[in-house]
Amino acid sequence: MSQAITGQPVNLTASGAIYGKPAQLIGFYVNSTTAGTIILKDGGSSGTALSGTITPAVGWHFFPADFASSAYATIGGTLNVTFIFQP
């Protein structure tokens, strides 16, 4: 028997908070993009980068990551992305 991995969604089209408290990212779904990029950070816009610059294709991206204080995404280009996380 398999167990589903579930989480809470948050959609972003510009840089912003994924979640303002400690959280675990499961991954993200890119709804649409035109040269879009993502940098994931722990601790807000000036926080510690947990990734390099990601240039994702449309679709699901499994990206497990722990955010000790808060989860933030810096978005460049044109990108519509839904992050799935667990508080």
Sequence positions of predicted segments:
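C-terminal interaction-tip segments
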Residues: 1-21, 76-87
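Tight coil/turn sites that cap or link beta-strands
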Residues: 13-15, 57-59, 68-70, 78
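Short, surface-exposed binding/anchoring microloops in extracellular/periplasmic proteins
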Residues: 15-33
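Noncatalytic modules at the cell exterior or secretory-pathway interfaces
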Residues: 26-28, 64-78
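Residues on the solvent-exposed faces and adjacent turns
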Residues: 32, 42, 75-77
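Short, surface-exposed beta-strand/strand-loop-strand elements in extracellular ectodomains
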Residues: 34-50, 82-86
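Glycine-rich strand-loop-strand elements at beta-sheet edges
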Residues: 47-68
